[in-house]
Amino acid sequence: MQPGDTTVDLEKINAALATVNDPEIRRPLTDLGMIKDINVEPSGSVAVTVLLTVSGCPMRNTLTDDVSRAVAGVDGVTDVRVDFDVMTDEQRTELRKQLRGDSPDPVIPFAQPGSMTRVYAVASGKGGVGKSSITVNLAAAMAAQGLSVGVVDADIYGFSVPRMLGVTARPTQVEGMIMPPRAHGLAVISIGMFTPGNAPVVWRGPMLHRALQQFLADVYWGDLDVLLLDLPPGTGDVAISIAQLLPNAELLIVTTPQMAAHEVAERAGAVALQTHQQIAGVIENMSGPVYDANGNAIELFGSGGGQAVADSLARTTGTRVQLLGQVPIDVRLREGGDAGRPLVLDDPQSGAGAALHQIAAKLGQRERGLAGVSLGITPVSKL
């Protein structure tokens, strides 16, 4: 540092930089050793050199804006210039150790004893019920409510979460760690970020399991309050892998009011009985009537499907399963997904937006525990 003859207080500059988080790691630049140099001119002009984890870091512009804004607020600063350099291999190794410790193999933090992250696997028995739309809107609503949220697009074959969240950036990799892109205040990972164009993914079960394991263990999620997983429809390999990798994950079952949809949704929820997972609740999407030109109500998908699923799963599992909410039909829910802008952010007071915010609030406030979990054991009498 070269303070020169100036009234600018270097301690205040360092304090200002301590408020700037790395956009991917979500921790202060000063804590991560990413401030290489601070040069203060007598005129009050300040140059800050920031160390990037990789040369092609996609967050360069964000860092420039955030550092400039923080330093410009210090008394006496007349101008701010942000320069960049790249970490050495040794510095990246130290960063990895700081974030992950000295463990030789990555571990899934959400599966470790003492993890306070609430994990919800969003499932449906069949496609076309709006499961992915529900997932991204719940995630965006929770983030808007102040929670730290991550989303795993676990629908490897039918990935759609990046588009629905408007994510086009590819993840940055640092010493074997994957830094998930961020959008709307949440972190997200998807196989779609690693495939060229709209290329299909043609994998067998073991490859699916490995991909999910990497998304959970190799991605640096930081300290999450909630992790949401958008599962593929049905009860196949991915559902089994999630139960193995994240035994504490709770199932969210999405259905429509339609009879055929809720019958299939019951099968998806009944998987919890075999995997000893808890069912967090049922969400009925595409709910409520629409009206014709004469004002007559039309139940496009019938009614009562969500409650029927909740009641059936309660009987099957022997636990309390509640209908968390009913999300009205709203074309803007689909339009928001196409545009990468969740409805809960654009119109949180709309019928669908308000319903999703209410469901998100219920899930975000739930305490973790063993209530409702089938432990897979049989009590025996004491001898």
Language-model regions, residue ranges each:
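Extreme N-terminal, non-catalytic leader segments
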Residues: D31-M34, P42, T53, R60-A123, ...
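Short, thiol/selenol-centered motifs that function as redox-active sites or metal-ligating centers
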Residues: I25-R27, S45, T49-V67, Q91, ...
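Short edge beta-strands and adjacent turn/loop segments
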Residues: E24-L51, V327
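C-terminal boundary of histidine-terminating zinc-finger modules
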Residues: A339-Q349
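Phosphate-binding loop that captures ATP/GTP phosphates
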Residues: M142-G205, H209-A217
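N-proximal, solvent-exposed amphipathic alpha-helical segments enriched in charged/polar residues
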Residues: Q2-K36
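Walker A/P-loop phosphate-binding motif and the immediately C-terminal alpha-helix
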Residues: R118-I156, G269
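Conserved catalytic-core segment of NTP-binding enzymes
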Residues: V67, R210, D218-W221, D225-E335
